[in-house]
Amino acid sequence: MKKREHLGLGFFEWQIILWLSIWLAISQQALGLRPIREKPRSWSDEWLFGRKQEAEVGPFSAWNITGTYRGTWKFLNSLNSSSKFQDFQKENGNSVVELVAVPTKITGVHYVQGVVVFHDVFDNEQNVGGAQINLEGVYIWPFRQLRLVANSGKESDSGQEDNNLLSNPYHLLGIFSSQVFQESPRDRLLKRKLSPVNEMEKHCNIEIAAQVSRVASSENNGDKNYYHMEGLMESPGVGDDGDCFSPLLLNATSVNVEVYYNKAVNYTLMVTFVSFLQVLLLIRQMEHGNTQSGAAKVSIVMIGQQAIMDAYLCLLHLTAGILVESLFNAFATAAFFKFVVFSIFEMRYLLAIWKATRPSNSGEGWETMRRELSFLYSRFYGILLGGILIMYQFHNYMQPILLLMYSFWIPQIVANVVRDSRKPLHPYYILGMTATRLAIPLYVFGCPHNFMRVEPNKVWCICLCTFMGLQAVILLLQHYFGSRCFVPRQMLPEKYNYHRRFNRDVSRTTDCVICMTAIDLRQHTSDCMVTPCEHFFHSGCLQRWMDIKMECPTCRRSLPPA
């Protein structure tokens, strides 16, 4: 008692000191759990918390913000006031953010890796267009706060990060379409190294502070939650260089990936249906020209060109199915039908045309025929592989290359004029193939909301339809009015006349070896036809015979077209 009085501390004083110690300990722990609320805020933090609504705090449930976000960006001050990166001159544009959030051992904190892609950033003179920046940071879900940074001077292989982050169908299909229709990975990497944003990542500390909110339930589709992020992107320079660019306002909403699943599945259903129609059209055409003479009238180049196109489509759909594993079944089905069209029907018809054009009385053995057949296959697959290399090297000119590939009716038009062929193709085959071949390119380059996210090009689509329609019209004119109906007579070669005059000094009659009935040669009428080898037949009999074989029924010599 004396000692306590000597210290000057009573029981009441000791109680106050004890409660103060407990309060300080609890407040320090609370301060550690609330680093964002209690630390000194920048003007961007004040803006961010000023826009936060009370209703957004709600119950403290962990939100999984992993996914793809698409939205817009714009400068707060309308223009970039910084002079360090003057190429950053656009006022606004589109942006895509890809985030992967992983829970940590710290309660309420998720570790986040991400990629932000800014479209329409630089002038067209840069030939870059957009900027891609790799980010990492934390998401503090009790306060719906997202903090991301991209440190300057950080050299890393972005390819491995892209493989880990950009793994959903939305981005994978975009990568696939950009590689096929727009640019190669080599050019994309070269542009990234030469891009001003590469220097930006080296000399700037990029910081993003965003507020995450849940999209209203009326805007949701299904049970999946969708989120909206709104925040600021600042880029203070390293040292005393000043800001790299003015603050950016980011707005992005999570993308409904199921929509892209459905679009991709609907596309594969369309390709499957189109392939089935092409099989029916090929069967109809093969029945139309099921004779040796009918098959010989068809251009082997025309069928081979279509077979190569279907082989390319088969490989493309199979590659897309392997790239996007969740859509493998849908794309593999489309690839299978294209494989059936290419390998079973078109290659079979190609061989029938090749056999019909070979002379049947050449007397060559099986070894010679097998050698010629091997040469045919070698040329076909050589052109197939060579075309892949050419398209890879000239991928920037994909649309002109497609126009060249869709000129497959031209070899048949030229063959009709040269051979004076008579109705080689069925009209249904001409119209059906023209329409079904246009389905895929019109979807890719004409549909504004295609799943590949290729920018529509209406002018090119109109040119393609006009080009294909003109070819089909010429083939139909040749079918109904003759193969050389549009060629001036002065340019036509001399044509053999089967109704030519013959020597009637000796009055005689002869038999038609086709129908075995007599032919009266004393009167020159259109009912009688004479071959270059001086054999006589009824007009109807010889025309039906030439539809099967272009050989004289009597002496087996080849006959000129009628």
Curated annotation (Swiss-Prot):
Domain of life, per lineage: Eukaryota
Cellular compartment(s): Endomembrane system
Protein name stated in the entry: Transmembrane E3 ubiquitin-protein ligase FLY1
The reaction(s) this protein catalyses: S-ubiquitinyl-[E2 ubiquitin-conjugating enzyme]-L-cysteine + [acceptor protein]-L-lysine = [E2 ubiquitin-conjugating enzyme]-L-cysteine + N(6)-ubiquitinyl-[acceptor protein]-L-lysine
Cytoplasmic compartment segments: 284-297, 343-373, 419-426, 480-562
PROSITE patterns linked: ZF_RING_2
Pathway in which the depicted protein is active: Protein modification; protein ubiquitination
UniProt keyword annotations, A-Z: Membrane, Metal-binding, Signal, Transferase, Transmembrane, Transmembrane helix, Ubl conjugation pathway, Zinc, Zinc-finger
Organism from which the protein derives: Arabidopsis thaliana (Mouse-ear cress)
Domain-related comment: The RING-type zinc finger domain is required for E3 ligase activity.
CC annotations in GO: endomembrane system; membrane
